């Protein structure tokens, strides 16, 4: 089954993406705690705004990182993990 890049991700209610100076990186805050994101996840997370679909997020990152092999597949994988962990909703 292929991933539907026309879906628009948004953070679930109660989840907030932000830079956390104490962690020296981006985190995802939620009522029960916090998840520190790696640099790649932070770049993707910074583009999740409830407006852009996955295809637009991929296009934006392809502009920033031209020639990176399998970039689209990596972003799809992040979206699948984030959805499975209930961080995002895809509509």
Swiss-Prot record:
Q: Which UniProt keywords apply?
A: PQQ biosynthesis
Q: Name one GO biological process term.
A: pyrroloquinoline quinone biosynthetic process
Q: In which pathway does it act?
A: Cofactor biosynthesis; pyrroloquinoline quinone biosynthesis
Q: List the disulfide bonds.
A: none
RNA-binding among the record's keywords?
Answer: no
Q: Name one GO molecular function term.
A: quinone binding
Which Pfam families does this entry report, sorted A to Z? PqqD
Q: Which domain of life is it from?
A: Bacteria
HAMAP family tied to this protein: PQQ_syn_PqqD
Q: What does this protein do?
A: Functions as a PqqA binding protein and presents PqqA to PqqE, in the pyrroloquinoline quinone (PQQ) biosynthetic pathway.
The similarity comment for this entry is: Belongs to the PqqD family.
NCBIfam families xref list: PQQ_PqqD, PRK02079.1
Q: How does it assemble?
A: Monomer. Interacts with PqqE.
Q: What is this protein called?
A: PqqA binding protein
- Species whose genome carries this gene: Pseudomonas fluorescens (strain ATCC BAA-477 / NRRL B-23932 / Pf-5)
């Amino acid at each position: 089954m292929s991933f539907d890049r026309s879906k628009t991700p948004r953070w679930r209610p109660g989840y907030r993406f932000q830079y956390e100076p104490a962690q020296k990186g981006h985190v995802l805050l939620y009522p029960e705690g916090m998840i520190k994101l790696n640099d790649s996840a932070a770049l993707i997370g910074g583009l999740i705004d409830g407006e852009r679909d996955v295809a637009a997020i991929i296009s934006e990152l392809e502009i920033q990182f031209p020639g990176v092999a399998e970039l689209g597949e990596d972003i799809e994988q992040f979206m699948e993990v984030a959805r499975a962990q209930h961080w995002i909703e895809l509509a």
